[in-house]
Regions:
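Multi-pass membrane catalytic core of lipid/isoprenoid biosynthesis enzymes
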Residues: 97-138, 227-251
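Cytosolic, membrane-interface loops and tails of multi-pass inner-membrane proteins
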Residues: 14-28, 87-108, 204-232
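Hydrophobic alpha-helical transmembrane segments in multi-pass integral membrane proteins
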Residues: 174-184, 243-248, 298-312
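Interfacial loop-to-transmembrane junctions
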Residues: 231, 272-300
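Intramembrane alpha-helical segments
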Residues: 110-179
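Membrane-embedded alpha-helical segments that form the functional core of polytopic membrane enzymes
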Residues: 47-89, 97, 125, 138-149, ...
């Protein structure tokens, strides 16, 4: 009897160890797929979608429709991120920032990543087409196409990849708008313009910090093509200057009120000021300051709009 109990205990211990190993493997796989989905970019995409949906809504918000929109958008964006990983798997080996990603590190097979990416993109688009509307599904398809097929290869060809890549980066805000309204009007294009312009200082600051990595990988980012930084600074300030008057347009059009005008002016001005140190000293520390300001900008703008619409 004692032997049987001991034998049973040993079996239970083995099962516990096996279960623990399985859990660790599952956790590891989950973290791999999370990294393939580019959660940092996904979060910005979802913020932009919420912003567009909120502003495109007249009357009460349909929370169910918003949830479905975010689900379809998240699946499409995650799949696009995975396919970007797949296409850049060789390039990523040369950069310190990316050499430990799942594919260059050999943690997952390329075919598995490609299948995952395609499945996620198709699932996301189908959800948007069937459960939301055709226009929103088309915008998601266009976003994925431009990001995967156009922007990703252009990084090896021209420094204009940032400006072209900012188009799919700005489309999610239109997707949010069309999900709630079913159409695109002038205000939606204003939001698109804000998102398009915002991406330039955001991504140029990243490109400046990672210029050594990009040069090693032979990617045609502007700080690599023109290492003195003059062109990069001009591009940053050109787009920041354009942002200031464009952020006034929702107030001028009567879509948003005085609280928005004051708040948007303050955060856009702060965004502009955060770029001044980089213009003076061209340091990575100053570029990081601008990057942090750009990440702070979008959720701040969303909060200002929500508060403004709440008091209108």
């Amino acid at each position: 009897m004692h032997f049987t109990c001991s034998h049973y205990t040993i079996k239970q211990t083995e099962r516990s160890k096996l279960l623990k190993i399985k859990k660790e493997i599952a956790k590891s796989r989950l973290s791999i797929y999370a990294e393939l989905s580019k959660l940092n970019i996904l979060s910005l995409v979802l913020i932009a979608t919420i912003l567009g949906y909120y502003l495109g809504t007249s009357g009460l918000i349909s929370w169910k429709r918003l949830f479905i929109t975010l689900l379809g958008t998240a699946l499409t964006a995650s799949g696009s991120g995975a396919l970007n990983h797949y296409l850049e798997r060789e390039t990523d080996k040369f950069m310190v920032r990316t050499k430990n990603r799942p594919l260059p590190a050999g943690l997952i097979k390329p075919a598995e990543v490609m299948n995952y990416g395609v499945l996620m993109v198709l699932a996301g688009i189908m959800i948007l087409v069937i459960q939301v509307n055709m226009l929103t599904g088309f915008i998601a398809l266009l976003t994925a196409f431009l990001y995967i097929v156009v922007y990703t290869p252009l990084k090896k060809i021209t420094w204009l990849n940032t400006s072209i890549g900012s188009i799919p980066g700005a489309l999610p805000i239109l997707g949010g708008w069309t999900a709630s309204s079913g159409s695109i009007d002038a205000m939606a294009w204003v939001l698109f313009a804000i998102m398009y312009l915002w991406q330039h200082p955001h991504f140029y600051s990243i490109a400046w910090i990672c210029r050594g990595d990009y040069a090693e990988a032979k990617l045609k980012m502007l700080p690599v093509v023109e290492p003195d930084g003059n062109s990069t600074i001009r591009q940053i300030f050109w787009h920041l200057l354009l942002m200031i008057p464009i952020t006034f347009l929702p107030f001028i059009q009567g879509a948003l009120g005085l609280f928005y005008l004051i708040g948007a002016f303050m955060i856009t001005s702060a965004f502009f000021v955060s770029a001044l140190p980089l213009a003076r000293n061209r340091s990575d520390k100053s570029a990081l300051l601008l990057l942090k300001a750009s990440v702070f900008y979008l959720p701040s703008l969303l909060l200002i709009i929500i508060i403004d619409k709440g008091v209108l």
